[in-house]
């Protein structure tokens, strides 16, 4: 492809796509009930996955005319499916989710937490980094063959998910501070006594993720 095509399809269109992915989540930013970093990360990741999924379906609609077994090397088709159906949505989810998390961190989180992510917690830096990740992924699809493109986009997806994981971790810490510490119970996972809160103080399991029957049994056992 020539330079004009690369600039249009590899840079301009991905940047416009990222902007569209951000519109929905940022509309929710002023609402005070969505005041956690985890809210921003969730909205951004959901918007990105939905957008990329719709985009991939729209761009691939002609492929349905080839039937259930299109011609060509099956390995290359598997690489295409993994790239467009898994790796690229993960890049978008990680990048846009982390970008939205940076906005929530700056404008909704307590002042004490605003430096917890370093420079990546600054909205402008997060925008540039997230856009660069997505543009790099799209350029890899345009310029590389199927298997090298899958490898490159897979590495970018891993980087985006690590970044998103940092944002989610901070959001979970913020939510844990909003929940009061309750009475001692017996953790049904490790059977040690721990205070009623978000996680078991001994084994680290999420107490709210345990089955309700197990939680009731823990309270009953402690009462005895």
Question: What are these language model-derived features?
Answer:
Residues 1-224:
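Hydrophobic alpha-helical segments at protein termini of multi-pass membrane proteins
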């Amino acid at each position: 492809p020539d330079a004009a095509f690369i600039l249009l399809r590899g840079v301009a269109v991905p940047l416009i796509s990222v902007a569209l992915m951000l519109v929905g989540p940022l509309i929710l930013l002023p609402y005070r009930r969505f005041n956690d970093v985890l809210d921003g990360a969730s909205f951004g990741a959901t918007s990105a996955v939905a957008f990329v999924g719709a985009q991939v379906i729209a761009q691939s609609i002609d492929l349905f005319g080839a039937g259930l077994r299109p011609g060509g090397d099956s390995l290359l088709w598997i690489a295409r499916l993994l790239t467009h159906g898994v790796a690229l949505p993960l890049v978008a989810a990680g990048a846009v989710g982390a970008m939205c998390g940076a906005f929530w961190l700056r404008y909704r989180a307590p002042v004490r937490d605003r430096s917890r992510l370093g420079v990546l917690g600054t909205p402008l830096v997060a925008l540039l980094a997230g856009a660069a990740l997505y543009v790099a992924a799209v350029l890899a699809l345009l310029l590389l063959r199927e298997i090298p493109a899958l490898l490159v986009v897979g590495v970018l997806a891993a980087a985006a998910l690590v970044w998103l994981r940092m944002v989610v971790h901070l959001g979970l810490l913020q939510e844990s501070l909003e929940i009061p510490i309750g009475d001692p119970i017996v953790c049904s996972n490790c059977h040690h006594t721990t205070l009623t809160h978000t996680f078991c103080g001994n084994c680290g399991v999420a107490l709210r993720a345990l089955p309700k029957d197990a939680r009731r049994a823990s309270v009953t056992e402690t009462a005895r």
